[in-house]
Swiss-Prot record:
Keyword Protease attached: yes
Record lineage: Eukaryota, Viridiplantae, Streptophyta, Embryophyta, Tracheophyta
Record's protein name: OVARIAN TUMOR DOMAIN-containing deubiquitinating enzyme 2
EC number: 3.4.19.12
Gene: OTU2
Keywords: Hydrolase, Protease, Thiol protease, Ubl conjugation pathway
Species whose genome carries this gene: Arabidopsis thaliana
OTU domain boundaries: 5-127
PROSITE patterns, sorted: OTU
Role summary: Hydrolase that can remove conjugated ubiquitin from proteins in vitro and may therefore play an important regulatory role at the level of protein turnover by preventing degradation. Cysteine protease with a preference for 'Lys-63' and 'Lys-48' -linked ubiquitin (UB) tetramers as substrates.
Consequence when changing C63S: Reduced'Lys-48'- and 'Lys-63'-linked ubiquitin (UB) chains. Abolished Lys-48- and Lys-63-linked UB chains
Amino acid sequence: MEGIIVRRVIPSDNSCLFNAIGYVMDKDKNKAPELRQVIAAAVASNKEKYNEAFLGKLNEEYCAWILNPDKWGGAIELSILADYYGREIAAYDIQTSRCDLYGQTRNYDERVMLIYDGLHYDALALSPFEGAEEDFDMTIYPVGKDRSIGSIEGLALNLVKDQQRKRSYTDTANFTLRCGVCQIGVIGQKEAVEHAQATGHVNFQEYK
């Protein structure tokens, strides 16, 4: 397979994980409502596995929470979606260049890839050349007997490391944010969460 790995930008609307998955799985950047329903149904159907200790909240609370379009997805949701689609999901973290692979114990024979900057997920695609239309993107890759996707992995890692060199990520432990409601400044994800819980304000902007 020849070409280059490109980052396909997904809108920053609190549903980027779901819409990035929609793009790499179905070439559809508007799958968030449907995929949130899929996740809520999976969690509700297995209360033994998806208990309060696992979810960080009661099963019923989580199901209502994940259906809220303002709530973000993460590892739990990626794991469920890997099983839903029957494909591995590789999520590359720009800051560390680490790859978290979901569904890897299931022996799925295909893989898709996402890239994560600390706050936001975008899709990764194999494009025939720089500037090619998204219609030509390849987003689903066969997994070989060695459980790799061959040269695609190297191309993806090169892109991730290039983004890392450009500091195209957010250090969520130390970034500085300003509340869009009351303009107060906070440092790091922990302080932002505490401020949101105390005030109900959830609109933050990063500033340097």
